[in-house]
Swiss-Prot record:
PANTHER family: LARGE RIBOSOMAL SUBUNIT PROTEIN EL15, RIBOSOMAL PROTEIN L15. The gene is rpl15e. This is Large ribosomal subunit protein eL15. PROSITE patterns: RIBOSOMAL_L15E (PS01194). It comes from Methanococcus maripaludis (strain C7 / ATCC BAA-1331). InterPro entries: Rbsml_eL15_core_dom_sf, Ribosomal_eL15, Ribosomal_eL15_arc, Ribosomal_eL15_CS, Ribosomal_uL23/eL15/eS24_sf. Coiled coil: none annotated. Belongs to the eukaryotic ribosomal protein eL15 family. GO terms for molecular function: RNA binding; structural constituent of ribosome. SUPFAM superfamilies: Ribosomal proteins S24e, L23 and L15e (SSF54189).
Length: 194
């Protein structure tokens, strides 16, 4: 078995391997850090490489923390019945992973989101690492596995739901019975797919 396979097996169920202790010590530092922070190298090298990461110029890895659970809605100031306040049990039509990708893209407007993966969670928040690519960098333009990102059609991928997590949230990972309202898009079918 290769080194990547050992790492992959350890991360499958972190609670049953050495990853549990690593995460426990790492999260103590992560909680004190800003919500979006650039990291020198990926925490999960196997997953990062599987999703397109290479240790070369023009590629950046960012760790993003996002709150867990449903949407945090402000309480209305004027009087209302408690049943009609609409504060609790309100969920976004978007996964937390997509929110993490969008925040990373907003922090680094000159970079495009390639992909992202989970690295940890506690009772309050989840952490994702987002792979970002500089589409104007010469080493990216000359690399066949990345230069498709240089086209204008891939601008703002994260906010348009064109990443892997975005397509999953839009229902484009599935086909057949039950997905009639998913294509061409959710909005084209008056949001009946959601």
């Amino acid at each position: 078995m290769s080194m990547y396979n050992y790492v992959k097996e350890a991360w499958k169920v972190p609670a049953n391997s050495y990853v549990k202790e690593l995460q426990w010590s790492r999260m103590q530092d992560w909680r004190k850090e800003p919500s979006v922070i650039r990291v020198e190298r990926p925490t999960r090298i196997d997953r990062a490489r599987n999703l397109g990461y290479k240790a070369k110029q023009g590629i950046v890895v960012v760790r993003v923390s996002v709150r867990r659970g449903g949407l945090r809605k402000p309480r209305p100031k004027h009087s209302k019945k408690p049943s009609t306040l609409g504060i609790n049990k309100i969920t976004m039509a978007k996964s937390i992973q997509r929110i993490a990708e969008e925040r990373a893209a907003k922090k680094y407007p000159n970079l495009e989101v390639l992909n992202s993966y989970w690295v940890g969670q506690d009772g309050k928040q989840k952490w994702y690492e987002v792979i970002l690519v500089d589409s104007c960098h010469p080493s990216i333009k000359s690399d066949k596995s990345y230069n498709w990102l240089c086209k204008g059609t891939h601008k703002g991928r994260a906010t348009r739901g064109l990443t892997s997590a975005g397509k999953k949230g839009r229902g484009l990972m599935y086909k057949g019975k039950g997905t009639e309202k998913v294509r061409p898009s959710v909005r084209a079918n008056s949001k009946k797919a959601k």
